[in-house]
Amino acid sequence: MKVLSVSSEVFPLIKTGGLADVAGALPGALNPHGIETKTLIPGYPAVMKVIRNPVARLEFADLLGEKATVFEVEHSGMSFLVLDAPAYYNRTGGPYVDATGKDYPDNWQRFAALSLAGAEIAAGQMPGWQPDLVHVHDWQSALVPVYMRYAPTPELPSVLTIHNIAFQGQFGPSIFPGLRLPAHAYSMQGIEYYGDIGFLKGGLQTAHALTTVSPSYAGEILTPEFGMGLEGVIASRAASLHGIVNGIDDGIWNPETDPMIARTYGASTLKDRAINRKQVVEHFGLDDDDGPIFCVVSRLTWQKGMDLLASISSEIVAMGGKLAILGAGDAALEGALFAAAGRHRGRVGVSAGYNEAMSHLMQAGCDAIIIPSRFEPCGLTQLYGLRYGCVPIVARTGGLNDTIIDANHAALQAKVATGIQFSPVTAEGLLQAIRRAIYLFQDRKVWTQMQKQGMKSDVSWGKSAERYAALYSRLVSRGA
């Protein structure tokens, strides 16, 4: 089977979050199932700089008003189709925002162009390769099934994965002519959304199957609390909705082979984590004592619960804990966390921005990772924590609920606990969870058992890839 995947970011070419990890790892996990995937991605400067020996496969003289070329290239064992459209993607900022952190005003056009290019490839316009199915990710490529639905060519089966329904790609109605869709596409059954244009909403209406990244989140987005205004649309497609938990790429996230950490180790050599811990201590300027180091690797936003963490930093320090924080996001939250580091030198350290190598080192050297998200479709950092023996402390929501076994009395007695869950998602709830963690950490036998149990957990893509392969097969055999 041949699959066209369309994503606005893919690791290792370009990454701003977990979407890139998933889009980068799933194709390889599907290979053993006889599924050949080519991934269409925008030609951002960071992408164009690293690709080698690109082969031009498709030319667009007028892709929503601009010239573009699709290049095929092999990189890191994956097959990519890179949409080189300098007018859209050759920007000095990031994939979605400029150097000042503001959304590009033409994001609608940039990602509609990506979607239209995907629909053209799906329609057989790229010589020598015809996909059997299209898999798109989030709002940035959600118009692919919309363009296919309204095209004169036969429609391919399509899958839309919702990684985070909070990001919907909503724009004013004035952009509609620029999308070059027929007039009747601007309707409740199409992309119209309360008078505006909804990219994700259009994809939800037209994709043949919908997936999201955990079973719990699939249920949550059917409710007003988590559906972000789209719960009605999703409820109307509930029979086509599947919750499939993400996995991690064991070739990249493996403490036994990881080149980004100071000392590799396994479940039988946990003492070697001390070398990594020492480097974390040095990087963040922390006191080198026996107290637990709690780490955070996250966007610093309200959704991620970073305001809760900032509000209890003094209490964590008073209990003997230390904090190592890596991330960027809301300026006020960044300021609050840096202020905490200033008040508690040697106990709280903050490193602004995102650093892939440092994120690996923190998982390999810290004792626990804190993930207090108010909602979390799946989450990957808790899976990395399991794999690296960095015990997850998580809010009981979404994929965090599906992937972590809470250290309650029964789970500890049965030796199956892998982390600590808390609810409600409040500052007091988080503080109680950290208090439990510090209590358990004092019994090194219990803590080590939790680490080893987490490291034994199957967090690979194996089972999830089987579910995707089965879904693809059903759709292709049924036809669009």
Swiss-Prot record:
GO terms for molecular function: alpha-1,4-glucan glucosyltransferase (ADP-glucose donor) activity; alpha-1,4-glucan glucosyltransferase (UDP-glucose donor) activity. Coiled coil: none annotated. The gene is glgA. Its EC number is 2.4.1.21. PANTHER family: ALPHA AMYLASE DOMAIN-CONTAINING PROTEIN, GRANULE-BOUND STARCH SYNTHASE 1, CHLOROPLASTIC/AMYLOPLASTIC. It catalyses: [(1->4)-alpha-D-glucosyl](n) + ADP-alpha-D-glucose = [(1->4)-alpha-D-glucosyl](n+1) + ADP + H(+). It comes from Rhizobium rhizogenes (strain K84 / ATCC BAA-868) (Agrobacterium radiobacter). This is Glycogen synthase. Belongs to the glycosyltransferase 1 family. Bacterial/plant glycogen synthase subfamily. GO terms for cellular component: cytosol. Synthesizes alpha-1,4-glucan chains using ADP-glucose. ADP-alpha-D-glucose binds at residue 15. NCBIfam families: glgA (TIGR02095), PRK00654.1-2 (NF001899). GO terms for biological process: glycogen biosynthetic process. Pfam families: Glyco_transf_5 (PF08323), Glycos_transf_1 (PF00534). Pathway: Glycan biosynthesis; glycogen biosynthesis. The keyword Transferase applies. Keywords: Glycogen biosynthesis, Glycosyltransferase, Transferase. SUPFAM superfamilies: UDP-Glycosyltransferase/glycogen phosphorylase.
